[in-house]
Amino acid sequence: MNHHNSLDSSDITYKTEELLEATTNRYKITVQVANRAKRRKYEDVDIIDDPQIKPVIRAILEMVDEITQPEIISD
């Protein structure tokens, strides 16, 4: 996930819009993002992965990648 290190706010906004457009239920995807971010925050408490990227941003980026690049999770 090193390609996420140089994201600016416009990239994050674009990815968020991409995620919202890919789903039919905005509420459900928002809850999923929040739950993933919360889970990741507590699971990775010992791991200092990248303090620049907040858990919610990381969750959005991961979910967009999973939706737009299904080959990532099929391997």
From Swiss-Prot:
Enzyme category, top tier: transferase
Catalysis performed (reactions): RNA(n) + a ribonucleoside 5'-triphosphate = RNA(n+1) + diphosphate
Any one biological process term the GO annotation gives: DNA-templated transcription
Keywords tagged on the record: Chloroplast, DNA-directed RNA polymerase, Nucleotidyltransferase, Plastid, Transcription, Transferase
EC number(s) on file: 2.7.7.6
Listed Pfam families: RNA_pol_Rpb6
Keyword set includes Transcription: yes
GO MF annotations, alphabetized: DNA binding; DNA-directed RNA polymerase activity
Domain of life: Eukaryota
Predominant localisation class: plastid
Matches recorded under InterPro entries: DNA-dir_RNA_pol_omega, Pol_omega/Rpo6/RPB6, RPB6/omega-like_sf
Transmembrane helix in keyword set: no
Signal peptide start and end residues: none
CC terms in the record's Gene Ontology section: chloroplast; DNA-directed RNA polymerase complex; mitochondrion
Intracellular or extracellular location(s): Plastid, Chloroplast
Family: Belongs to the RNA polymerase subunit omega family.
Function of the protein: May be involved in RNA polymerase activity.
Protein name, per record: Putative DNA-directed RNA polymerase subunit omega
Organism (species): Porphyra purpurea (Red seaweed)
